[in-house]
From Swiss-Prot:
GO terms for cellular component: cytoplasm. This is Urease accessory protein UreD. It comes from Polynucleobacter asymbioticus (strain DSM 18221 / CIP 109841 / QLW-P1DMWA-1). It is found in: Cytoplasm. Required for maturation of urease via the functional incorporation of the urease nickel metallocenter. The keyword Chaperone applies. GO terms for molecular function: nickel cation binding. The keyword Hydrolase does not apply. It comes from the Bacteria.
Length: 291
């Protein structure tokens, strides 16, 4: 498939460049003046902008800056976030994370969240965009006590359909683990293989190029909440979604779509519905969503 010159050169440059390891460690605490970013340590091209407070001092917003050229084979992103007792943190990214073709080793993103008592976390990254030939590992691990609450999502876009590039080759490994007080309560280990017919079957993705998952945990998660959410689940030729409450008290919303913007807007709507219930604060759209 022919690529526009700029994109072709950029992808080739990143794919052939030496791989790198980037680390980011963030620690938040609740103080008398609100939630503060107490520690920010980084190695390599992965860092954060300054702490922002568009909702007031109680809620700390932080934007994680990914490498601007994207992620190629052999690269590793390691992100560790500790949200202290009583803190409320909103984490986001400014743009899509691009996963380029891997010629040898896979690229890996490893994200770990540790929440304290009564802590609250919104994990709202932009989508992951997988180029043809991408070989990627996405690992997310969460540990929280029963009193804490979490809302987070991940969206995957397979191929660059606007440029006419189908995701005809590549592999994605997804691993999600959730622990409550250190005890494993949920594990999801999935594989998406572009050349596997099952990956394009109805039980998996049904040939939809976009898929998204939202997870919510907290004392307010209930059957009643899941039933209310079910009323806003679309089922059209452009986007389809469903909601489930797991016995462990995890609300899971999954969606597939033909368009990433449509999926993103749907997830924002679900988050806006959940946030006042799960976190006890109004939903305020992030400014970067409008850019």
């Amino acid at each position: 498939m022919f690529l526009a010159p700029d994109n072709a050169v950029k992808q080739l440059f990143r794919s052939l460049s030496p791989s790198w390891m980037a680390k980011l460690s963030l620690s938040y605490e609740r103080t008398p003046i609100g939630t503060v970013l107490k520690k920010s340590l980084h190695e390599g091209p992965l860092r954060v902008q300054k702490a922002l407070y568009p909702e007031g001092d109680d809620i700390c917003h932080t934007v994680i800056i990914h490498p601007p050229a994207g992620i190629a084979g052999g690269d590793t992103l390691d992100i560790q976030v500790a949200v202290g007792k009583g803190s409320h943190v909103v984490l986001s990214t400014p743009s899509a994370t691009k996963w380029y073709k891997s010629f040898k080793n896979p690229a890996t993103q490893n994200v770990q969240f540790e929440l304290g008592e009564n802590a609250k976390l919104d994990w709202l990254p932009q989508e992951n965009l997988f180029f043809k030939g991408a070989n990627s590992n996405l690992i997310t691990k969460l540990n929280l006590p029963a009193s804490a609450s979490f809302i987070g999502w991940d969206a995957l876009m397979l191929g660059r359909h606007a440029s006419g590039e189908e995701w005809s080759s590549g592999h994605i490994h997804l691993l999600n683990e959730i622990r409550r007080d250190g005890q494993l309560i949920w594990i999801e280990n999935g594989h998406i293989d572009a050349e596997d017919p099952y990956s394009k079957s109805l039980p998996q993705l049904g040939s939809w190029p976009v898929c998204a998952t939202l997870l919510a945990l907290g004392p307010q998660c209930s059957n009643h909440l899941a039933e209310n959410l079910s009323e806003m689940m679309p089922w059209t030729n452009s986007i389809r979604a469903g909601v489930t409450l797991m016995p462990q008290g995890i609300v899971i919303v999954r969606a597939v779509s033909i368009d990433i913007e449509m999926a993103r807007n749907f997830m924002i709507d679900v988050w806006s519905k959940l946030r006042p219930i799960i976190h006890g604060v109004p939903a305020q759209p992030l400014r970067l969503w409008a850019s």
